[in-house]
């Protein structure tokens, strides 16, 4: 997920995303898996829906003639020729991609409503509400996207992209952040995230250069330091926050590279510079595609993860092409193509047969009938805010996460 087009092999398929149709039909209950896929509120931002600056902007009533251009901000790997080229031929909308390496970069690119340059962004749950409440996304007429009705209920109007019943985009895919390892160095799969904090692997660890990693540390401490009483890795008291930052600061001497781009982590493993690290199914898929002995697991402590949305920029210069894209990318066939190529889970519940057409058994391989317990083991990204979900102003806001990451962790 970042900058620079990824040349992934269609033969490289990740078997890491485990979620069932029955799971998503239930929705995201309480606990770690519930952070972004329920309701239609501000998801604990403490900000009233009336404060969304663009809430009353008019929406398209019908899709008109395409403008010929579509400017997208995307995670690396989200705009592969397999599905972009047919879209361009069908619509006449030529896709121009700008790749971002972090959610912070996406938020920055979307400032001032995309600046009249960008049409859409494939943002994750830790960025969506920042973009929405900054007035940089505009409401979407979900009725112009027929395949939206085929989505699992949990992703039709999730709290990370829908505020007070107003949609600011259309859900796309979701997946976990996984523990990657070189099978030659680890004949037996690691079972705990503790391996990336182990001094034994000094200079061999790679993790994202992203403040949201503080949540990964908090999730680890939730199990290994229960006295902290962490219940949600994105809602941390000052004491819980400092403990998580301290753990990451102690990890710094072990880090070979804080990667900004997915392609950087791929290179670290291919070159033998990294033997273990935190990454996405995309990197796993790409490395498998070149026959690299990569392994990946969701350890016993669980994992953080993302749920992505194609959000419409407030000043999108090509709205008709943007709506055409949302309609196209939401269809089961295209969702299946991206899911199998990237190694993530589609939001369209009808994508499964198309996945098996692309790669026989891939729907089962991605554990589409996984138990609810797996879904709950994934803590989906959301924006840390000062007001906790219990209404108390005891949580550390994201601005302090950013500051701690740059001043206490990576430097």
Residue spans for each PLM region:
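Early extracytoplasmic/lumenal segment of secretory-pathway proteins
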Residues: 44-131
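Paired acidic/hydrophobic, glycine-rich loop segments that form the ligand-binding mouth/hinge
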Residues: 117-122, 258, 275-280, 295-296
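Bacterial signal peptide processing site
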Residues: 29-32
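C-terminal motif of bacterial Sec signal peptides marking the signal peptidase cleavage site
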Residues: 23-27
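Conserved C-terminal helix/tail region of periplasmic/extracytoplasmic solute-binding proteins
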Residues: 41-45, 375-411
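Extracytoplasmic ligand-binding site segments that recognize negatively charged/polar headgroups
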Residues: 71-80, 105, 117-118, 122-270
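Extracytoplasmic/periplasmic substrate-recognition and gating elements
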Residues: 279, 288-341, 411
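Mature extracytoplasmic/periplasmic domains
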Residues: 313-379
């Amino acid at each position: 997920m970042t900058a620079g087009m990824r040349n992934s092999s269609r033969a490289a398929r990740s078997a890491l995303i485990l979620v069932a149709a029955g799971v998503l039909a239930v929705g995201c209950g309480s606990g770690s898996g519930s952070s972004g896929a329920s309701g239609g509120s501000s998801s604990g931002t403490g900000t009233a829906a009336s404060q969304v600056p663009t809430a009353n902007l008019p929406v398209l009533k019908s899709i008109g003639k395409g403008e010929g251009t579509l400017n997208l901000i995307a995670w690396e790997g989200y705009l592969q020729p397999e599905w972009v080229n047919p879209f361009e031929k069908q619509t006449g909308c030529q896709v121009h991609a700008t790749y971002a390496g972090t959610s912070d970069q996406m938020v920055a690119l979307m400032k001032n409503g995309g600046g009249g340059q960008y049409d859409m962004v494939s943002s994750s749950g830790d960025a969506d509400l920042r973009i929405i409440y900054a007035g940089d996304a505009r409401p979407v007429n979900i009725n112009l996207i027929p395949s939206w009705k085929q989505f699992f209920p949990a992703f039709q109007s999730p709290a990370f992209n829908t505020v007070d019943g107003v949609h600011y985009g259309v859900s796309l895919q979701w997946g976990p952040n996984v523990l990657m390892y070189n099978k030659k160095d680890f004949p037996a799969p690691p079972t705990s995230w503790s391996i990336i904090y182990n001094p034994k692997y000094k200079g061999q660890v790679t993790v994202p250069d992203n403040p949201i990693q503080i949540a990964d540390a908090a999730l680890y401490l939730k199990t290994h330091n229960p006295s902290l009483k962490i219940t949600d890795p994105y809602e941390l008291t000052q004491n819980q926050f400092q403990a998580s930052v301290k753990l990451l600061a102690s990890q710094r001497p072990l880090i070979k590279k804080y990667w900004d781009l997915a392609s950087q982590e791929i290179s670290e493993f291919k070159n033998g510079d990294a033997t273990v690290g935190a990454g996405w199914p995309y990197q796993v898929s790409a490395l498998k595609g070149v026959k690299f002995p990569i392994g990946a697991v969701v350890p016993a402590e669980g994992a953080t993860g993302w749920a992505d949305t194609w959000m419409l920029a407030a000043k999108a210069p090509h709205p008709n092409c943007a709506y055409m894209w949302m309609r196209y990318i939401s269809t089961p066939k295209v969702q299946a193509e991206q899911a199998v190529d990237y190694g993530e889970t589609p939001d369209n519940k009808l994508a499964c047969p198309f996945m098996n057409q692309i790669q026989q058994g891939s729907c089962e391989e991605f554990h589409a009938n996984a138990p609810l317990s797996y879904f709950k083991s994934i803590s989906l990204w959301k924006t840390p805010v000062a007001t906790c979900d219990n209404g108390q102003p005891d949580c550390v806001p994201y601005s302090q996460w950013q500051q701690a990451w740059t001043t206490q962790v990576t430097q």
